[in-house]
């Protein structure tokens, strides 16, 4: 299972676990389960609710603050059954109890809780699919609770041995839905900034994806379309959370990520030493980052590629990324989808870096041609990663 809030996936063999039998206690009664697209139905039943949550996650107050409903909060956790560990790292850990995933944070609880509440409320109020639903939170325990999923998209990619027509059709459907969800969130002032296979959670039927949602809002930031001033998010027992500086001004490292899945213009600004503009993250930049990253996840799934991460982020590495992208996109995507190598070489200000780029283009090889069956997925990749910053897809998704 994969946790809706991040933490990676486990093999199908780990799914043979007893279901949980009871929920947890909360200041305002039993915890309320949230769902959408069926992602919380089973968890809702196990936690004592017949239907997924329809009530707001945030309630506006006259003083401008936002109150978190009592029935979404809990002070103690009492889920029976053997938990399955599906992720651990510097952020904390994720345990799955049957149909429920519990993410316990060592640090950053306030930021992630606020961003998760905002994303969940926007998606709930608009009926948007493709965004994981929050089931509960606990400030004392530094926990967030989500529906558990079968695996993440990276695990699904590894499980595929072939990509027949029905698999391609299902992937096109769920990735289009994920793209629309990201367009929606960015339009509401929320840029995810950490879209990757490990943060997309899926349920399958055989080798076909049935449901996919984006989760893990630990790096989410407000963009220039956000109308939020400086509200407090009021919890039970007079506790409150606030929007952090990370949400208002994401650092350069977050914007650049692992470089490989970032928009060409973001990488070019880094290569040429241009700092991010002052003020909030521009909406167009946040949207382009999210859609370009989603496109690279789809590219990896369509071609069975293993994403390369962990390289030191230098200008030389960014040049290498762009050189490989020019060659790969020219070979795989529809004409005009990728960046022009000649134009990019002229845009690089330092001659030494420009020369390195030209050498990288000359030495890169696109690899084997993909099967024709995945052509519809590559067309969708082109829309996500196009040089227009994803604007074409955003127009279609509006």
From Swiss-Prot:
It is found in: Virion tegument; Host nucleus; Host cytoplasm; Host endoplasmic reticulum. It catalyses: L-seryl-[protein] + ATP = O-phospho-L-seryl-[protein] + ADP + H(+); L-threonyl-[protein] + ATP = O-phospho-L-threonyl-[protein] + ADP + H(+). SUPFAM superfamilies: Protein kinase-like (PK-like). ATP binds at residues 86-94, 103. The keyword Cell division does not apply. Multifunctional serine/threonine kinase that plays a role in several processes including egress of virus particles from the nucleus, modulation of the actin cytoskeleton and regulation of viral and cellular gene expression. Regulates the nuclear localization of viral envelopment factors UL34 and UL31, by phosphorylating the US3 kinase, indicating a role in nuclear egress. Disrupts host nuclear lamins, including LMNA and LMNB1. Phosphorylates the viral Fc receptor composed of glycoproteins E (gE) and I (gI). Displays a substrate specificity similar to host CDC2. This is Serine/threonine-protein kinase UL13.
